[in-house]
């Protein structure tokens, strides 16, 4: 029978094991989750399996960049505790994974975790599993991204190993690209320009603003103007071009780029543990404070 991605995901969540291990277990057991767990235990995966119930919400963000500075990879690798996130073996593993992503161009996370790491035949996921057994915590290669700048450069910024940004910039100086990466780390834009915001997000915000404006009791034509104004403000807050530049709030990023003769055509921002239920420190505010010299 064909093994689905949903089955692999469920088995990963229940065992904490890697994609390839879970897929193999499901193939061996005809796709039955419970039997697959038992099979994995029989294959000597029990030690790692015992770590599966713990949430790996700490970790680090690591980047790797090509020699010509026009291509970069960024990886988030999670651990259970901040203490392990500072472990040298853990860091080396994360750096090796980022380098492998950079040189191999994997299309998916499953592709990345099945790649060989270093000169040996051990895969990324096999190395991860060995580290779980050695360190004694659940570890997870959570996500990665690749960013290329064919006609420009890559700006990158990592704050305290917990926030990472890659931004592809055409025109301007490398210093500008780095400043933009720092800005994105602090200001968390959702897209470059208003046209890049998904329609469903705009529709949801519009509905919220209409509901709020109706409570004012004003005429429909006034309500429409109020809604449009609030939507414009919303878009300026969540798009890179509309945001005040973090190092000089008197100028917007759009004007900063125009004055420098530069364009941003892609960026990626990772923050450790995004979407994982845990206590979150406000590292974005810390970046903003540092950038503004507070």
Swiss-Prot record:
GO cellular component: cytoplasm
Protein's name in the database: Elongation factor Ts
A molecular-function term among this protein's GO annotations: translation elongation factor activity
Region (Involved in Mg(2+) ion dislocation from EF-Tu): 81-84
Family per record: Belongs to the EF-Ts family.
Localization: Cytoplasm
Gene3D superfamilies noted in UniProt: 1.10.286.20, DNA helicase RuvA subunit, C-terminal domain, Elongation factor Ts, dimerisation domain
Pfam families associated with the record: EF_TS
Role, per record: Associates with the EF-Tu.GDP complex and induces the exchange of GDP to GTP. It remains bound to the aminoacyl-tRNA.EF-Tu.GTP complex up to the GTP hydrolysis stage on the ribosome.
Swiss-Prot/TrEMBL keywords: Cytoplasm, Elongation factor, Protein biosynthesis
Lineage top rank: taxon: Bacteria
InterPro entries hit by this protein: EF-Ts_dimer_sf, Transl_elong_EFTs/EF1B, Transl_elong_EFTs/EF1B_dimer, Transl_elong_Ts_CS, UBA-like_sf
Main localization category: cytoplasm
Gene: tsf
Keyword presence, Nucleotide-binding: no
């Amino acid at each position: 029978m064909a093994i689905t991605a949903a089955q692999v995901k469920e088995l990963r969540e229940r065992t904490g094991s890697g994609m390839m291990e879970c897929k193999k277990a499901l193939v061996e057991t005809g796709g039955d989750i419970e039997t697959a767990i038992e099979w994995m235990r029989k294959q000597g995966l029990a030690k790692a399996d015992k770590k599966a119930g713990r949430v790996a919400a700490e970790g680090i963000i690591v980047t790797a960049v090509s020699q010509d500075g026009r291509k970069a990879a960024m990886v988030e690798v999670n651990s259970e505790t901040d203490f392990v996130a500072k472990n040298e073996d853990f860091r080396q593993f994360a750096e090796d994974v980022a380098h492998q992503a950079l040189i191999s161009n994997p299309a998916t996370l499953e592709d990345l975790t099945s790649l060989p790491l270093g000169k040996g035949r051990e895969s990324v996921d096999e190395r991860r599993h060995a580290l779980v057994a050695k360190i004694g915590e659940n570890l997870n290669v959570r996500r990665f991204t690749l960013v290329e700048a064919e006609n420009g450069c890559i700006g990158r910024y990592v704050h305290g190993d917990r926030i990472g940004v890659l931004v592809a910039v055409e025109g301007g100086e490398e210093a500008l690209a780095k400043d933009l990466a720092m800005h994105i780390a602090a200001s968390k834009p959702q897209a470059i320009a208003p046209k890049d915001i998904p329609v469903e997000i705009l529709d949801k915000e519009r509905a919220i603003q209409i509901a709020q404006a109706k409570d004012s009791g004003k005429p429909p034509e006034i309500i429409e103007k109020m809604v449009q104004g609030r939507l414009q403000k919303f878009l300026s807050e969540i798009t890179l071009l509309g945001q005040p530049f973090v190092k000089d709030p008197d100028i917007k990023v759009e004007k900063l780029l125009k004055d420098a003769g530069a364009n941003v055509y892609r960026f990626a921002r990772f923050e450790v543990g995004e979407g994982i239920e845990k206590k979150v420190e406000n590292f974005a505010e810390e970046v903003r404070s540092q950038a503004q010299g507070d």
